[in-house]
Amino acid sequence: MNIYEKHVLPRILHCACGSKPITRQREKVVPKVSGVTLEIGVGTGLNIPFYKNSNVGKLIGLDPYSENWKIASQVKEENDVAMEFMQADGEEIPIPHGSVDTVLVTYTMCTIPNIAKAINEFKRVLKKDGKLIFCEHGVAPDKNIKKWQDRLNPIWKKCMGGCNLNRNIPELISDGGFVFDKLDQMYIPSTPKFAGYNYWGIAKVK
């Protein structure tokens, strides 16, 4: 990890992913968690304020970068939310099989290198009746927008810490062995369309 990725990028992402339209998206999904909850890619803690309105039990925040947790821990204290930090990758979650009620992932599936492996891990750690709650940006349905996503993706990925603009989120979740209880999608307002097509909902293991 270079200096940019270690010290600069986390704060850029904290600002970008904390915009009002994205914050409204977070507010839609985070309160739906319940029981033992594992947040994948807790990052700088942008979801933390919304746990107060949920039925969360034990809360675990997983992230590969301890630098993010330095920011997230401040947010945690400000909101009086108890969260255990776990430094690990989404592709290899150090949690036993069938041990969590909810897996929450927001604006993170775009970045995980081996996303198929990570989704298998989500499925592995969930209890039999557990749920995957997600809110992600991804491939747009409009051909012209998708073309721009494909063109911009290489440089975007390099500058934004591995973020991909053009992943098909519903397809990835479905192919990973989940079925949707709820799936919504739209361009979020006040956001460039190439980065602003959102998918969010709830899925359960097939």
Regions found by a protein language model. Name each.
Residues 129-137:
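Conserved beta-strand signature within the Rossmann-like core of class I S-adenosyl-L-methionine
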Residues 161-177:
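Short alpha-helix
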Residues 38-92:
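Class I SAM-dependent methyltransferase SAM/SAH-binding core
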Residues 178, 185-206:
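Core SAM-dependent methyltransferase catalytic element
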Residues 88-103:
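A short acidic, Gly/Pro-enriched loop at the edge of an enzyme's catalytic core
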Residues 116-128:
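A short glycine-rich, Lys/Arg-flanked "PGG" loop and its adjoining helix->strand segment in the class I
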Residues 16-36, 46-50:
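Conserved alpha-helix/loop element of class I SAM-dependent methyltransferases that forms part
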Residues 101-115:
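A short SAM/SAH-binding and catalytic strip from SAM-dependent methyltransferases
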